């Protein structure tokens, strides 16, 4: 049993929680299901460390991510979007104590994701006024600059892992393609089956807003196209587009932002499969795909 989990169990009694059970684990957080004082199921999101690092992102501020999750969930719930209700945010006073977010636990019936319904939900999300916050993933700069800089950073990181890796795309070319990018919408940027709770295939909650940015729908679609290459994400991009088009215009494939956002996503996935969750088949193939996208630009 880890020291942080032992500390969590101690705190759980103080918060009136019982029956902690691990239900998910990622790079920065573990998620437990528990029962609250009122008998309702609760999701307990626990940061592994105060600051974390991985191949894609250095010095991840997990406290800032928990605060962002809390604020975004409350903002979207107030606008009628299906999210896991954020109940309480506990920020530790001591380094030994974990930061924890308590949310409503939203079950999934295992029926699979209806991509058409997901498209309709994403159109609703992108029309909601964005929350008054600076997303953690923006690193305190504009979305266009954040994407340009992380493409360069991740490209260089892959170059230390892959032989004969070429020079990166010119940063001015990337910035030029993002010149028209607005920040009028909240985009999730991690939409896949693991982060969508469903009932009879229909999305009933969007989870995990760690990657969120303020941007335009083209950012979301660039990420969706790349995620859809992996069947476990359960994404049918054409069905998503059809559902989205019921209430909002779908970004065209000719949108210059979309090609950049595809490259941004492809580089992230290449690093995932090269070193975060190493896969001897997917890693090199993902790096080759990212290189091809860059050459098209």
Give the predicted meaning of each segment.
Residues 219-250, 263-279:
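Active-site activation/catalytic loop segments of kinase-like enzymes and analogous catalytic loops
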């Amino acid at each position: 049993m880890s020291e942080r989990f032992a500390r969590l169990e101690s705190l759980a009694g103080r918060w009136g929680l019982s029956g902690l059970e691990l239900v998910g684990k990622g790079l920065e957080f573990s998620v437990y299901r528990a029962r609250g004082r009122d008998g309702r199921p609760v999701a307990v999101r626990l940061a592994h460390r105060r600051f974390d690092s991985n191949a894609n992102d250095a010095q991840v501020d997990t406290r800032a991510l928990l605060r962002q999750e809390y604020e975004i969930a409350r903002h979207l719930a107030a606008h009628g979007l299906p999210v896991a209700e954020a109940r309480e945010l506990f920020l530790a006073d001591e380094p030994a104590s974990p930061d924890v977010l308590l949310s409503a636990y939203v079950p999934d019936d295992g029926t699979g994701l209806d991509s058409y319904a997901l498209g309709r939900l994403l159109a609703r999300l992108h029309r909601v006024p964005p929350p008054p916050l600076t997303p953690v993933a923006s690193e305190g700069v504009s979305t266009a600059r954040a994407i340009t800089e992380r493409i360069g950073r991740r490209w260089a990181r892959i170059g230390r892992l892959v032989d004969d890796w070429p020079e990166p795309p010119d940063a001015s070319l990337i910035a030029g393609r993002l010149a028209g990018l607005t920040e009028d919408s909240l985009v999730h940027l991690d939409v896949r089956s693991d982060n969508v709770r469903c009932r009879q295939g229909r999305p009933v909650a969007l989870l995990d807003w760690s990657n969120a940015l303020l941007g335009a729908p083209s950012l979301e679609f660039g990420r969706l196209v790349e995620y859809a290459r992996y069947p476990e994400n359960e994404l049918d991009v054409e069905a998503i587009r059809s559902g989205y088009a019921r209430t909002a215009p779908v970004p065209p494939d000719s949108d210059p932002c979309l090609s950049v956002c595809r490259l941004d996503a492809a580089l992230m996935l290449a690093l995932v499969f090269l070193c975060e969750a190493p896969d001897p088949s997917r890693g090199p193939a993902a790096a080759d795909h990212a290189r091809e996208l860059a050459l098209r630009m």
